[in-house]
Amino acid sequence: MTTKYIFVTGGVVSSLGKGIAAASLAAILEARGLDVTIMKLDPYINVDPGTMSPTQHGEVFVTEDGAETDLDLGHYERFIRTKMTRRNNFTTGRIYADVLRKERRGDYLGATIQVIPHITNAIKERVIAGAEGHQVAIVEVGGTVGDIESLPFLEAIRQLAAEVGRNSAMFMHLTLVPYLAAAGELKTKPTQHSVKELLSIGIQPDVLICRSDRTIPANERAKIGLFCNVPERAVISMKDVDSIYKIPALLKSQNLDSYFTERFGLECKEADLSEWEQVVFEEANSTAEVTIGMVGKYVSLPDAYKSVNEALKHGGLKTRLSVTIKYIDSQDIETRGFELLEGLDAILVPGGFGERGVEGKILAAQYARENKIPYLGICLGMQVAMIEFARNVAGMTGAHSSEFKKDCAYPVVGLITEWVDDEGNVETRTEKSDLGGTMRLGSQLCHLVEDSKVRQMYGSPTIYERHRHRYEVNNKLLPQIEAAGLKVTGLSADKKLVEIIEIPDHPWFVAAQFHPEFTSTPRDGHALFAGFVKAAGEYQKRNLK
């Protein structure tokens, strides 16, 4: 099977939505019965985004096989059924690390190591490996054309396209077509210059996706096609929409998928977008609105919680409730108290690292428990719930996590030094281990306890969910906490690590060590988020009576 490649680049400005465009195109091609995968090539020097600040880079998305990757891979998994792996995302740093390791080993037999051919060859090898076994591979190059960091990647995809031939490779370029209110017209010159920049490095785009706040009329698209040497039918207008899940239908209405399948000579059925039509229908036809408070430390950049944001929306789709997220900085709770939490229908505390703001998260868990407000804790959100319960219910004054206070009286959360993954392999860590890539990562088996909320929601005795953490509940102190009324309802593969906790005498208080947001999709939703949003709606109804 010959894989067909679609290379996606962006020009004029950053944040044009290359990831959404790539994922939407993939969704249409998948709906035509094609086996599609998507890759993201990131030009930064970090080996992976695992140690990057969420307020700079946004969320770190974790794949099933435990790779810490770009948040765009989350978009990919939400739009197509193909599961991403560590082969779907790599960086300049990863490429250079691989090449330098080979050089030190003597693999290059004394050759002078250069960007061309050694770095570009390494990029091509990884792209080919990631595309293996798929009919279509969509390859998104991060950054903006013209950035110095992107040049090796652009050169590599130029070479690869030449090697596989015109019938197996196409280039799709996203640009901005701004509307100038003073002139009362759309301006195409930035797009022309962006394409000129691409041409200067040997790439002629086959398709232009033109981003704008309005539909670009046919005469303007014809003008863009003429000056950029692209057929008019391949100049696609992608206007701003109120939901990203409308993009597949928007692109399909302009026959973008047919343009690719015709060029590639692929015979396949017409795209059935009924599942996406259902998503859009559910989104537009909610019966009520709930407000969920997200208490975190990275709230200045909502993209730091991208998958959580989307999972809450998916929970709303499955319960016919519109979800409004109120972002609350946990540090503000420390200074202003519970007033910031008033009027919420539910409280969610997501994952995070470091001591800053942790006491505010503990207060949020306390407020939710004492006021019977639905609470969902994720990763650190479970740990702070344990700390709060230990302090205020189990009588363990001074309880904390050893991550934040090593000499605390009751270290109810501590470093995981050893665990068994779902395949039976023993993983070990110490406090001296590197920060990058050393956490408990990826999909892990979890046993659910009978007669628990989570067992009822999932409808299965075992589940697989993705993890990203170094710290876990201290089992030595667990009996005292459980005796006070908290219940452990989820356990790891070897049944030694606490994965889920509940408070039985609370209407809905559930916290998980794993990250359920990474497996939520708009078409299928997720059991935990659907249950959480439903509980928020029920809480709202109780308070309106």
Curated annotation (Swiss-Prot):
Residues 291-542 form the Glutamine amidotransferase type-1 domain. PROSITE patterns: GATASE_TYPE_1. Disulfide bonds: none annotated. It catalyses: UTP + L-glutamine + ATP + H2O = CTP + L-glutamate + ADP + phosphate + 2 H(+); L-glutamine + H2O = L-glutamate + NH4(+); UTP + NH4(+) + ATP = CTP + ADP + phosphate + 2 H(+). ATP binds at S15, L16, G17, K18, G19, I20, D72, K239, D240, V241. The keyword Magnesium applies. It is an enzyme of class 6 (ligase). The keyword Phosphoprotein does not apply. Residues 1-266 are annotated as: Amidoligase domain. GO terms for cellular component: cytosol. The active site is at C379 (nucleophile), H515, E517. UTP binds at S14, K187, T188, K189, P190, T191, Q192, K223. Pathway: Pyrimidine metabolism; CTP biosynthesis via de novo pathway; CTP from UDP: step 2/2. One of its GO terms (biological process) is pyrimidine nucleobase biosynthetic process. CTP binds at S14, D147, I148, E149, K187, T188, K189, P190, T191, Q192, K223. Homotetramer. CTPSs have evolved a hybrid strategy for distinguishing between UTP and CTP. The overlapping regions of the product feedback inhibitory and substrate sites recognize a common feature in both compounds, the triphosphate moiety. To differentiate isosteric substrate and product pyrimidine rings, an additional pocket far from the expected kinase/ligase catalytic site, specifically recognizes the cytosine and ribose portions of the product inhibitor. Belongs to the CTP synthase family. Catalyzes the ATP-dependent amination of UTP to CTP with either L-glutamine or ammonia as the source of nitrogen. Regulates intracellular CTP levels through interactions with the four ribonucleotide triphosphates. HAMAP family: PyrG. This is CTP synthase. It comes from Aeromonas salmonicida (strain A449).
